[in-house]
């Protein structure tokens, strides 16, 4: 795969919310091998539960779920690895070549969502911890009723190293911070005000959610990423882009094939592309003393139909076609951590991770846990203080699959 194609995927992976097409002119200055080791080949042929056939990016609109995780040495020492970490950022993105359009929908990490891997509602951030990228894809499909064709996952460590490689960034910190450092081995203290931040400090600003909300956190992440790309556009940063590419490449994973990336690059880097962004609308909710973000069915339907239109699929006019509405009709509300009545589920709202495991007998056993060993919820030590509740987090039945937020 040539560097033109690799750079296209790297831009998508690192940004998570904005695709800077202007960087296409720099493609031929980038690394030759940044993404070979990051390809998830065993899931390259995954077909969405909501598709009759696997999509062809060269001929059809597609969707990609972008996942940002925080995998560091401190958390690994506590038994958490990349496959069992929570997702800190989740962006469902559609690519429509005929409209020259990319649409990105941000899904807040605390969104209450059905997770097929475990068979009950929980925070959507936990889906990745329960079963990796495929479990996260299944959860998004179950909630949104929109096909999720591919995923790109990036470790937040890439953000830290990229900021440092580019010499830091300037940002107006909204309040005094005292946050865990990148490896969760100490604290980072930052004063309020406009200042230059190194990678660890920038990540601390991006991660904090004790002073405001999950939505504000997402907005800060967008601002910091945009600033980082503006920094990369500076003339004196161009000679550092090769190193940035290597940084992102070693901290990413995806299930796109070389030919699929080639098709995407051909269509979206050689044409003017309109970028649209949105975020699920909803309300803060306390369920059993735990904070959740509860998107309205109206918002889910609205954005699902926009995304489905991008994918050239028919709209969903009946709210009862959304699982959340059927559950509310049946129980009166969404009930977390409680197995659902099977009559509420449709065949596409099933776990595909065990199916993938069966077809890949030699795969790493940590990627797909047997249903008899599914994780149980445990107290989340990083509670959302402004909501006054204690969060729940997935935890394995053994230390191998334990999770730390």
UniProtKB/Swiss-Prot annotation:
Bias category Low complexity: which stretches? 360-373, 381-392
Query: Residue spans with biased composition (Polar residues)?
Result: 393-405
Residues covered by region (Disordered): 348-405
Keywords linked to the UniProt accession: Signal
Q: What Gene3D superfamilies does UniProt report for this protein, alphabetically?
A: LCP protein
Q: Is Signal one of the keywords?
A: yes
- Per the UniProt entry, the signal peptide is 1-34
Q: Which residues lie in Basic and acidic residues bias regions?
A: 348-359
For this protein, the parts annotated as crossing the membrane are none
InterPro entries on file: LytR/CpsA/Psr_CW_biosynth, LytR_CpsA_psr
> Taxonomically, which superkingdom?
Bacteria
**Keyword Signal: yes or no?**
yes
What the record says about family reads: Belongs to the LytR/CpsA/Psr (LCP) family.
* The protein's name in its UniProt record: Uncharacterized protein SAOUHSC_00997
């Amino acid at each position: 795969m040539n560097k033109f194609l690799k750079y296209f995927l790297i831009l998508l992976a690192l940004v998570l919310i904005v695709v800077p097409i202007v960087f296409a002119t720099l493609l031929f200055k980038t690394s030759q091998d940044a993404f070979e080791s990051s390809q998830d080949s065993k899931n390259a042929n995954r077909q969405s539960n909501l598709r009759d056939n696997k999509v062809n990016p060269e001929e059809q609109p597609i969707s990609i779920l972008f996942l940002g995780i925080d995998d560091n040495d401190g958390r690994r020492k506590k038994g958490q690895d990349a496959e069992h970490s929570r997702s800190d950022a989740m962006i469902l993105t559609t690519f429509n070549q005929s409209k020259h359009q990319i649409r990105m929908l941000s899904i807040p990490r605390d969104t209450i969502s059905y997770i097929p891997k475990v068979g009950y509602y929980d925070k959507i951030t936990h889906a990745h911890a329960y079963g990796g990228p495929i479990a996260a894809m299944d959860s998004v499909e179950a909630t949104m009723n929109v096909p999720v064709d591919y995923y790109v996952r990036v470790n937040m460590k890439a953000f830290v190293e990229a900021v440092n490689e580019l010499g830091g960034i300037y940002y107006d910190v909204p309040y005094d911070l005292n946050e865990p450092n990148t490896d969760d081995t100490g604290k980072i203290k930052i004063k309020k005000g406009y200042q230059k931040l190194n990678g660890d400090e920038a990540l601390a600003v991006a991660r904090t959610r004790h002073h405001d909300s999950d939505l504000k956190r997402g907005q800060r992440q967008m601002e910091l990423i945009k600033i980082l790309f503006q920094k990369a556009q500076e003339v004196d940063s161009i000679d550092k882009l090769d190193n940035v590419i290597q940084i992102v490449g070693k901290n990413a994973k995806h299930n796109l094939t070389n030919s699929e990336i080639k098709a995407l690059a051909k269509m979206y880097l050689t044409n003017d592309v309109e970028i649209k962004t949105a975020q699920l609308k909803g309300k803060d909710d306390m369920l059993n003393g735990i904070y959740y973000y509860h998107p309205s069915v109206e918002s889910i339907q609205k954005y699902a139909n926009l995304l489905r239109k991008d994918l050239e699929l028919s709209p969903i006019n009946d709210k009862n076609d959304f699982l959340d509405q059927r559950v509310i009709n049946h129980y009166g509300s969404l009930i977390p951590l409680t197995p659902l009545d099977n009559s509420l589920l449709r065949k596409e709202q099933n776990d595909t991770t065990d199916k993938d495991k069966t077809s890949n007998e030699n795969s790493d056993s940590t990627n797909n846990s047997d249903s008899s060993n599914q994780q149980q919820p445990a107290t989340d030590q990083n509670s959302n203080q402004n909501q006054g509740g204690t969060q729940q987090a997935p935890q394995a039945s053994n230390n191998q699959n334990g999770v730390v937020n």
